[in-house]
Regions:
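Membrane-anchoring hydrophobic helices of lipid-metabolizing enzymes
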Residues: 1-98, 130-131, 210, 264-266
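A generic secondary-structure micro-motif detector
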Residues: 45-46, 114, 172-173
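Soluble or luminal CAZymes and related metallo-dependent hydrolases
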Residues: 47-51, 142-146, 235
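Short amphipathic alpha-helical segments and helix-helix/interface helices
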Residues: 56-57, 98, 125, 151, ...
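Non-catalytic C-terminal accessory region of glycerolipid acyltransferases
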Residues: 1-24, 145-266
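Structural motif corresponding to alpha-helix initiation and N-cap regions
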Residues: 69-72, 121, 145-148
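Catalytic core of membrane glycerolipid acyltransferases/transacylases, capturing the structured
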Residues: 78-140
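Short, flexible loop segments at the rims of nucleotide/cofactor-binding pockets, characterized by
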Residues: 59-65, 137-142, 172-174
C-alpha cells in the first residue's frame, strides 16, 4: 500500500512496488535464465509443466465462478494467434484472462512474466515457472534472440500470448497504468492483432472479491507504417481504451491523484 502510494506521488507508475518480489543481481538473472533455457527441454520440466497447467486449468474454472465477461462480440472473427494485454493487479490475474479467453473459444495461452519470478518460492513460484509461462528480462542477449523466439514459437503454435504492458504488478490497484511499448512492438513484428482487456475489480461484501473483464476493440497493426510508428500508435490506442474502460466501469474521471479506494480492500 505505502509503496504504491509513494510511486503514484512520484509519477513512477510502472515501477516495482511489491515488497516480497525477489531482487536479483545481474549474475543471478544470468544463472536463472541459462538454467531455464537448458531445463525447459527436459523430461522433468515437461512433467512439472503438465501438473502446473492442470492446476491452472482447475483454478481458471474456479475463478470463472466470480468473473463476468463483457464485450465478447469484439472478438468475433478472431481465429488467428494474437497478443493479449491486460491491467496487472494480482499474481493470479492471468487465470481471469484465461477464463475470458476460454469463453471466447481460445484454449491455449502463454503468459509472459518477469525473470525475477523464476526465483519465487512456494506454490506461486512453481506456477510462475511452469504454467505455460515465458520470462522477459532486462538482459540484452536474452531480449535480442531468446525472447522474440519464444514469442514467435507460441504464435506459430496458434497460441495467444499474454503480455502485461504495465510491466509490474500493483496488488489490487484498480486504475490502468501507462503501457510500455514491448507488447505492441511484437504485434507489429509478427503481424498479429492485440486483444485488449481491462479487468474491473468489484467488492460485493467483506469476503467476496469479484471481477468483470471488459473485452475492448481489437487493435490491428498498420502495415503501411514503419515498425516504431505502428507500435507506438497501438500502444497509445490500447492505453486510451483501458482508460475509457476504467471511466465506464467505475463512473469516475481517471486521475493519478492517490485515493484510498484506488486499492481494493482499503
Amino acid at each position: 500500500y505505502e509503496n504504491i502510494k509513494t510511486a503514484v506521488s512520484l509519477n513512477q507508475l510502472n515501477s516495482k512496488v511489491e515488497p516480497g518480489d525477489p531482487k536479483l543481481l545481474r549474475e543471478d538473472k544470468e544463472a536463472l535464465l541459462r538454467h531455464y533455457i537448458d531445463y525447459r527441454a527436459s523430461y522433468g520440466f515437461c512433467v512439472k509443466k503438465y501438473i502446473a497447467e492442470a492446476i491452472f486449468y482447475a483454478g481458471t474454472s474456479a475463478v470463472g465462478l466470480i468473473t463476468q465477461v463483457d464485450g465478447l462480440k469484439n472478438l468475433s472473427g478472431i481465429k488467428e494467434p494474437a497478443i493479449v494485454t491486460c491491467n496487472h493487479f494480482s499474481p493470479l490475474d492471468s487465470a481471469i484472462v484465461r477464463f475470458a479467453m476460454r469463453k471466447a473459444g481460445f484454449t491455449r495461452i502463454s503468459i509472459v512474466n518477469q525473470d525475477t519470478n523464476l526465483a519465487m518460492k512456494g506454490f506461486v513460484g512453481y506456477m510462475q515457472r511452469y504454467a505455460d509461462t515465458m520470462p522477459v528480462s532486462s538482459l540484452k542477449w536474452f531480449m535480442q534472440t531468446e525472447f522474440p523466439n519464444q514469442i514467435k514459437s507460441a504464435l506459430d503454435e496458434n497460441k495467444l500470448v499474454l503480455i502485461y504492458p504495465e510491466q509490474e504488478m500493483w496488488f489490487n490497484y484498480r486504475k490502468p497504468r501507462p503501457c510500455k511499448r514491448g507488447a505492441y512492438l511484437y504485434a507489429v513484428k509478427f503481424n498479429v492483432p492485440v486483444i485488449s482487456l481491462f479487468v474491473e475489480q468489484q467488492v460485493k461484501s467483506t469476503h467476496l472479491h469479484t471481477f468483470r473483464v471488459h473485452v475492448l476493440p481489437v487493435i490491428y497493426p498498420d502495415r503501411q507504417l514503419d515498425e516504431r510508428t505502428a507500435s507506438v500508435r497501438m500502444q497509445h490506442t490500447d492505453y486510451e481504451q483501458k482508460c475509457a474502460a476504467y471511466v465506464m466501469a467505475y463512473g469516475k474521471k481517471l486521475t493519478y491523484d492517490f485515493e484510498e479506494g484506488d486499492i481494493v480492500g482499503r
